[in-house]
Amino acid sequence: MFQKDLFNNKTVLVTGGGTGIGFEIAKQFLTYGAEVYIASRKKEKLEQAVIQLKPFGGVKAFVLDIRETESIHHLADMIDTQSGKLDILINNEGGQFPSPAEAITENGWKAVINTNLNGTWFVTQEMAKRFFFRQESGSIVNIVLNNFKGFPGMSHSAAARAGVMNLAQTLAIEWVSKGITVNCVAPGIIQSSGLENYPPQLVESIASKIPMKRFGTCEEVAELTLFLAVSKYITGETVYIDGGNRFWGDMWEIS
C-alpha cells in the first residue's frame, strides 16, 4: 500500500503494542522501514511480540504503565539514549470493562479514566516536550473508540475517549506552530485479540447491523493509522473506520 522505504529513518513509539491493533500497527511500521518501540504493562506479551516482530525489523520493548509519569519518563530516557529522537507517537494503550453506568464503582471509573484519558495525556505531554518541541516536528495518532452515537455499557470509556478526541482537536491548534499533527482513529468492532472480552451475544448482534456485514481487521486500522502518521496537512481529525456503521441504524437495544 505504501512505498517500502516510507518510514526509513523514522522512530516510532506504539503504546499497547504487544497485542491486537497495536501489534499490527507496530508490524506495519517495521515493514515500511521504521525503528519501533512498543510499550505495554504486560511483560510476557511484550516478549512474545518482540519474537513475532523480529522478522520484520528492529523492535524494542519497554514495560510501561501509562498512568505513572515516572515510568513514562524512564521510557523517554531510553528512547533518547538509544535513538536520539522520536518522530511518531501512537497512543493505543487503553482498557475498559462492560458495565451498566449505575453499577460502575468509584475505583472502576477512576481506573478507566486514568488509563484511557490521563495516561494518553501523560505520554503525549512527555514525548512532545522531550522530542517534538525540540525537533519542531512530530505526528501523534490516538486510537480511540467509535462512540459517535454513545456507547451504552461503556460510559466510563466513552467519557475518556471523548476527552481524548477533544484533546486532539485542541492540541492540533495549540501545537500546529511547532510542526506537530494530532489525529485520532476511531475503530468500530475489530476482529482482534480483545473481542473475546465482550459478551458473544453483543458481538453477534453488532456484526449483523454493520452495513458491510463484517468486522474490520487490525490490518485495516493499521493502514489508516500509518496514513495519518505520514500526512502533513491533516490535523485535529477523528477518522472513523467502522464499515459505515455510524451512518446506518442503531447498534444498541433500549431496555
Residue positions per predicted region:
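Conserved Rossmann-fold SDR core element
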Residues: 29, 85, 165-168, 172-191, ...
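Catalytic loop of short-chain dehydrogenase/reductase
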Residues: 141-163, 168-177
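C-terminal substrate-recognition "lid" of short-chain dehydrogenase/reductases
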Residues: 214-241, 246-247
